[in-house]
Amino acid sequence: NLIDEQAGAIGFDEYMNTALYQPGLGYYSAGCQKFGSDGDFVTAPEVSKLFSKCLASQCSQILDDFEESAILEIGAGTGIMARDLLLDLDQCNSLPDKYYIFEISADLKQKQQKLLKQSIPKYIDHIIWLDTLPERKIKGLIIANEVLDALPVKRFKKESNLFKEVKVTFSDNKFCWVNTTAEPELVDSLM
């Protein structure tokens, strides 16, 4: 048990990462349909191409300022927004040199690759999937649609001028919050 292995509590980021992305078990990694009318929720790019068209219009204004440009999409879902955005950017003569997709879920990454290879094969050489966020700066844009709530994050709170990390424990057959002393790195990042 992960919580027992971590002395009775795990960071919320680890809990969230396990719940969402654990291979074969996590919400985004268990293979069931999540997006669209047959899934649990629908995002704007799946309803209409208008969202991506509007985004492409704004992106083209920014990308045109760079000799070499890139877009980094964080959490590309089914890949529909990436597909439509690249098609619209090409129509605006603003196709980026690179289109990076940072995707944690191997299942979603596979779906994105299948969709994009089948639907826009002429752009596939522009698309690069990343397993980690780039350490070097990109010249261009970072975009994310309906993804912030699916990123594993640490939780913290301030009590009596001290930062506490809010962790997850398991007690009486239920998950519970527990406040722990925050690691110095977390405190430094908050200051």
Where do the model's predicted regions map?
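Class I S-adenosyl-L-methionine
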Residues: I128, P134-M191
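Rossmann-like AdoMet
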Residues: N1-I74, T78-T132, R136-I138, F156
